[in-house]
Design a protein with these regions (language model features):
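Conserved PLP-enzyme active-site core in the AAT-like
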Residues: 1-166
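Short acidic amphipathic segments
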Residues: 165-176
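Conserved PLP-binding catalytic core of the aspartate aminotransferase-like
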Residues: 174-185
Length: 185
């Protein structure tokens, strides 16, 4: 797939189907302005595409695991959202926007297609003694109300930096979030 996330995922899922294996795809919402942001409709189509195993059975659909650490305010998993029809688990590290850098505990959620996986995640957290502490829950509860403002401020600062780079180095290849996409939410 070279540097094209969508075609790379398509190739990987086709290979996994040919092996009759269980596909887990982990992706991060990119924050580096030099990293490609995939077309979400094309990503959804590739993740939703039905594939066949070598014996003609329908291949197991992928579980898409999305790291939303840098955009925890964007809804991808609701019934009307872009990934509603793809088995998806989303997580965000609490060390960034959710806690304002005051703790490392984060959170994960699943859409309706992946909710059956959540008890396994809860069991894993329990067995590994990796659940947030009471203090981390308190920090998150105190910090979450101001999270959206921190995200807005970070976007404004980064947008100013990207604009500066584009003006100073017009030949630089930057893939920062477009104004149109920002206006969509």
């Amino acid at each position: 797939g070279e540097n094209d996330m969508v075609s790379s995922i398509d190739k990987v899922l086709t290979t996994i189907a040919s092996q009759d294996a269980v596909p887990y795809i982990i992706a991060e919402i990119p924050t580096n302005p030099r990293v490609e942001v995939p077309d979400l409709q094309n990503l959804k189509a590739v993740l939703s595409k039905q594939r066949q195993t070598p014996n003609g059975d329908t291949a197991i659909d992928p579980v898409f695991i999305l790291d939303q650490t840098f955009c925890p305010n964007v809804h991808f998993l609701g019934e009307e959202d872009i990934l509603a029809t793809v088995r998806t688990i989303s997580y965000a590290s609490g060390s960034k926007f959710p806690s304002g850098g005051k703790c490392t505990a984060g959170y994960c959620v699943a859409n309706n297609k992946a909710k059956a996986l959540m008890p396994n995640i809860a069991l894993h957290l329990s067995l590994c003694d990796n659940e947030a502490t009471a203090q981390q829950y308190e920090i998150l509860a105190a910090q979450l109300p101001s999270m959206l403002q921190r995200i807005k401020d970070a976007y404004v600062n980064t947008r100013e930096f990207v604009t500066f780079i584009k003006e100073t180095l017009p030949e630089a290849k930057l893939n920062f979030v477009s104004e149109d996409l920002v206006n969509e939410g």
